[in-house]
């Protein structure tokens, strides 16, 4: 599937696995492929560009890592729109070095449109994208944590692994020694993430199968949600999914092999449980109402509003009914 601004992009093959270093997997969102590839890229005299939290954790922003130590700031998912801060201009001025850019598909596309056709030293990784939420969510959530704990944040993650890959937790360490932990699912942060995506994300064209735009990067990374315990790719601490889409992508997956388990994934598994790889995520009904409540009354009030609670009760009831009927069917078949 070709992209609109590159003529060398096609889905070649997909792989799954995780770093052979258990800590590398544990402190990454999935299997640690992005960090492993970036480490090897820097060791080969390149630089990596990715997203980090700001020093006060009120927002996320693009930055450049020239050392392996600087890569740590890119680790774990950021579910908010990242500030660009002139990053496209900055990396275009980098001379005589290879550059690895890691970002959302639309941001990768923007980089190539800005860069032009002379991209010999530019390598790209796009992340399977569900649509980021507004930076205000991070700002409000972080401010509330600081207020409740009477301290500044020194570490924050929305994909913390307590005892395994799933479920996801929000976790924060504070300078005064306190800690905060809560399930991401059902949190005010998660609810806002569902409701406050950019409107344009619901019609995103940077998806596998789109005939005009489609895939844009050398490699796409995400979670291998379809993995099962008996598969070679499986780890209880997380599994990355990597789709190679160009010759440069083949080079990047070869870098991953130096530090990671890399096993082939049949294409049927790539699309089975990774809907956002090939379809945009639909906009939630009530987005504007949720936004008005958030701006007027705050994040917690918006998340607890009837706008959210009534549909949630309906969905939960529907799931219980489906589960009950499935169990009845299984019982009758076994008789």
PLM features: what roles do these ranges have?
Residues 123-144:
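Short, flexible loop segments at boundaries between secondary-structure elements
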Residues 1-103, 255-335:
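Iron-sulfur-cluster electron-transfer modules
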Residues 44-47, 151-335:
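Long, compositionally biased charged/polar accessory segments in the mid-to-C-terminal portions
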């Amino acid at each position: 599937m070709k992209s609109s601004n590159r003529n060398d992009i096609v889905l070649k093959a997909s792989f799954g696995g995780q770093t052979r270093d258990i800590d590398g997997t544990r402190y990454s969102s999935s299997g640690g492929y992005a960090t492993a590839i970036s480490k090897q890229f820097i060791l080969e005299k390149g630089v990596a560009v990715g997203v980090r939290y700001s020093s006060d954790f009120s927002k996320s922003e693009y930055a450049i890592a020239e050392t392996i130590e600087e890569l740590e700031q890119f680790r774990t998912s950021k579910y908010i729109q990242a500030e660009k801060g002139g990053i496209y201009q900055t990396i275009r001025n980098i001379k005589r070095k290879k550059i690895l850019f890691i970002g959302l598909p639309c941001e990768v596309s923007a980089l190539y449109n800005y860069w032009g056709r002379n991209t010999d030293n530019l390598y790209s990784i796009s992340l399977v994208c569900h649509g980021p939420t507004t930076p205000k969510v991070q700002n409000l959530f972080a401010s509330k944590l600081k207020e409740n704990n009477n301290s500044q944040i020194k570490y924050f993650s929305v994909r913390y692994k307590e005892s395994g890959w799933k479920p996801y937790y929000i976790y924060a360490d504070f300078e005064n020694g306190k800690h905060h932990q809560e399930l991401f699912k059902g949190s005010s942060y998660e609810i806002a993430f569902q409701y406050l995506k950019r409107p344009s994300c619901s019609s995103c064209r940077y998806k596998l199968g789109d005939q005009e735009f489609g895939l844009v990067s050398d490699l796409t990374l995400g979670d291998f949600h379809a993995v099962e315990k008996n598969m070679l790719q499986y780890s209880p601490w997380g599994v990355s999914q990597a789709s190679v889409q160009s010759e440069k992508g083949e080079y990047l997956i070869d870098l991953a092999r130096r530090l990671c388990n890399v096993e082939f994934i049949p294409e049927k598994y790539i699309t089975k449980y990774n809907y956002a790889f090939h379809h945009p995520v639909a906009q939630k009904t009530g987005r504007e109402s949720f936004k008005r409540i958030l701006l007027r009354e705050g994040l917690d009030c918006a998340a607890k509003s009837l706008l959210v609670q009534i549909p949630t009760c309906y969905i939960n009831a529907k799931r219980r009914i489906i589960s009950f009927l499935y169990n009845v069917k299984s019982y009758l078949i076994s008789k």
